[in-house]
Amino acid sequence: MSENSTVKKNVRVRYAPSPTGFLHIGNAQSALFNYLFARHYHGTMVLRIEDTDVKRNVPHGEDSQIDNLHWLGIDWDEGPDKPNPKYAPYHQTERQDLYHRYITQLLDQGLAYKDYATEDELTTMRDQQRAAGEAPHYDGRWYGRSVADQQAAEARGLKPSIRLHLPANHEYAWDDIIKGHVAFNSDNMGGDFIIEKSNGMPTYNFAVVIDDYLMDITDVLRGDDHIANTPKQIAVYEALGLKHPNFGHITLIYNPKTRKKLSKRDKETLQFISQYKNQGYLSEAIFNFIAFLGWSPEGEDELFSREELIERYDPARMSKSPAYFDQSKLDWINAAYIKRLDLDDMTDRVLELVDEGQTDVARQVKALQLPDLRTLTSQVCKIYQTEIHQLSEIMDKVLFYVTILQEPLDYDQLRQFDRTATLAVLTAFRKHVQALPVDVATPDFKKMIQTVSQETGVTGRNLYFPLNVAFTGDHSAPQIDEVLRLFANSTIIELLTKAIAHV
């Protein structure tokens, strides 16, 4: 690590998404590590919107990014919603005059030049280079061309792009916060590169330099797919006579099956934070999980609050190796956080998912319009809190129990047990339920099960498994006496009658 990267005074970092869609887990990883870095060093986190690629921007893409960052618990100190007059605006499309000012400076100094090459000419150039066994690169054909040549191109209706001229055999190097020393030679960077497109819009590698400089960004943490961009950005800094910030390149997230970078084509893995939210993953669990995708603390503990992660964060423990997305680990972490929830909090979170109606099961539960939905949801949460990995499973259970008389239960499981004992248990239990006074709102089902056991002489699995099948369709159901509280007595009697008919 460089000496500069260990000096952490007045730290300013930025997360700079493009409003091109939902918050991807890879982008969330970058946002999270910038957040931890800023908070650990008591610095400033900036949210900047890189929206110059207008064709790729989607309606409400920015709002979606911001909403999901808030849901994760990632906040910032400056941004479109928290402008600092010294650094605003925070949308690149609103900063065009700033970029053009520096473009003009480079043109005036002869460090950049206009390129009128057409796309067809550039394609032919690259094809010829490949045919000659060369790596495609810009050959500098418009560097040093006369004003007359430029005027002739203008007369043909051509609009120039602007390229930064790279000195030959020049090293662009930095001491990466994560990767260590990294160096590129200018001869292997594809030639002079475009810093302003022919439509007048700056390229990413130019605009980001101007923004980071003017916003006093001290440390740039981003995915290691940006490593090839960094020497180009350093070239811009050097051309302008500016000091570049510290760079740190975070390992990307990989699919453990293919051993390749996680791709949006990997349908087996949820890609977007909103999908995890809608499935009932807790924000604190997702935060905890992502923090381990590229970093690890000292010790063996794996469950940490945001505050603990901020305290323990150390960039020296960032990994250089790929981070593999372990779905089973995420499910384990989420289950652990669900177990910690207060019952009312858990109920609130499930009902919020129902109200938002972003999944089929949420919409189905919402459509039931149950007047006692909160009570029912709370009861189901109490029964299954230690059994589930996602809050969506609670919605599944609520829907199942409300519609259980229409559900095709697996009565074949009843044949695994002694037929005589099963009939005795189910029949005796039905008799006791039928005998309940109408005004008994909450029967003591645990005591009733004990009474049936005493009357029939049936105990253990031969007692409980048939009851589990009758009321859940699964012989391994938890807390059957609590499950029974979900039903009206008439429903219990009907379920017992159906089960008896299948013995």
From Swiss-Prot:
CC terms in the record's Gene Ontology section: cytosol
Residues reported to bind ATP: K264
Keywords: Aminoacyl-tRNA synthetase, ATP-binding, Cytoplasm, Ligase, Nucleotide-binding, Protein biosynthesis
CDD domains (UniProt xref): GluRS_core
Record bears the keyword Transport: no
Positions occupied by motif 'HIGH' region: 17-27
Intervals of motif 'KMSKS' region: 261-265
Compartmental location: Cytoplasm
Record keyword Cytoplasm present: yes
EC assignment: 6.1.1.17
Gene Ontology biological process terms in this record: glutamyl-tRNA aminoacylation
Chief location bin: cytoplasm
One term of GO molecular function: glutamate-tRNA ligase activity
Primary enzyme class: ligase
Substrates-to-products reaction catalysed: tRNA(Glu) + L-glutamate + ATP = L-glutamyl-tRNA(Glu) + AMP + diphosphate
InterPro entries assigned: aa-tRNA-synth_I_cd-bd, aa-tRNA-synth_I_codon-bd_sub2, aa-tRNA-synth_I_CS, aa_tRNA-synth_I_cd-bd_sf, Glu-tRNA-ligase_bac/mito, Glu/Gln-tRNA-synth, Glu/Gln-tRNA-synth_Ib_cat-dom, GluQ/Sye
Quaternary structure, from the entry: Monomer.
Family per similarity comment: Belongs to the class-I aminoacyl-tRNA synthetase family. Glutamate--tRNA ligase type 1 subfamily.
Biological function: Catalyzes the attachment of glutamate to tRNA(Glu) in a two-step reaction: glutamate is first activated by ATP to form Glu-AMP and then transferred to the acceptor end of tRNA(Glu).
NCBIfam families in the cross-refs: gltX_bact (TIGR00464)
Protein known as: Glutamate--tRNA ligase 1
UniProt source species: Levilactobacillus brevis (strain ATCC 367 / BCRC 12310 / CIP 105137 / JCM 1170 / LMG 11437 / NCIMB 947 / NCTC 947)
Lineage: Bacteria, Bacillati, Bacillota, Bacilli, Lactobacillales
